[in-house]
A protein has these predicted regions:
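A structural "domain/chain start" motif
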Residues: 1-47, 147-159
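Extracytoplasmic/secreted envelope proteins and their assembly/folding machinery
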Residues: 29, 33, 37, 61-65, ...
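Short, conserved beta-strand edge motifs with alternating hydrophobic and charged residues
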Residues: 13, 50, 77-79
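Second-shell loop/turn segments in exported
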Residues: 16-25, 52-55, 126-131
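C-terminal/domain-edge helix-coil "capping" segments
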Residues: 1-9, 70, 104-159
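Surface-exposed short loop/turn segments
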Residues: 58-111, 121-124
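Acidic helix-start/capping segments at beta-turn-to-alpha-helix junctions
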Residues: 46-64
Length: 159
């Protein structure tokens, strides 16, 4: 089947980070994209990356389709990474991270979304918060790709 072999080009935006603290954005982006590329290298998908971050909760369809068009992408993923503060330190976060993703087609239609809560999944959270971001991102991508596989290829939506 010729359709199966087609490499899907997926455009990833920078994750929106909650709480909105400059200091944690850089490490979050790094951990997020490292998990994405680890994940996609095993698959026939190509990661495209834009340094743009758009609000997870108010996504404009036209913006998505413009980005997909300009980057020749088949899909777009808008991620969000939510941290939980613990203790009274300025940047003391627990290992619990929720990674949310919304998957859009090239026209900017929402196909599916998922939340991956590292705490709820009862992962034995060892190590750093960065590690949790990777685990969460990995989990969220797997969910999204599972959904993606359920979508039947049909001529008109270009899969």
């Amino acid at each position: 089947n010729n359709h199966e072999a087609k490499i899907k080009r997926i455009l990833y935006f920078n994750p929106q980070v909650e709480p909105d603290i400059e200091e944690i954005k850089e490490p979050t982006n790094t951990a997020f994209f490292s998990a994405v590329s680890d994940n996609l290298s095993e698959r026939k998908n190509k990661m495209l990356k834009t340094e743009t971050q758009i609000s997870f909760d108010s996504i404009d369809q036209k913006t998505i389709s413009d980005y997909c068009l300009n980057n020749d992408a088949d899909f777009a993923v808008i991620p969000k990474v939510k941290y939980f503060k613990v203790g009274i330190g300025k940047y003391v976060f627990s290992n619990q991270v929720i990674v949310s993703m919304k998957l859009f087609d090239a026209e900017g239609n929402l196909i599916t979304e998922t939340d991956y809560d590292t705490y709820r999944k009862n992962m034995r959270l060892l190590g750093s918060t960065v590690n949790s971001v990777k685990i969460g991102t990995d989990g969220a991508i797997k969910e999204i790709l599972k959904q993606l596989r359920k979508i039947k290829p049909s001529g008109e939506n270009g899969f």
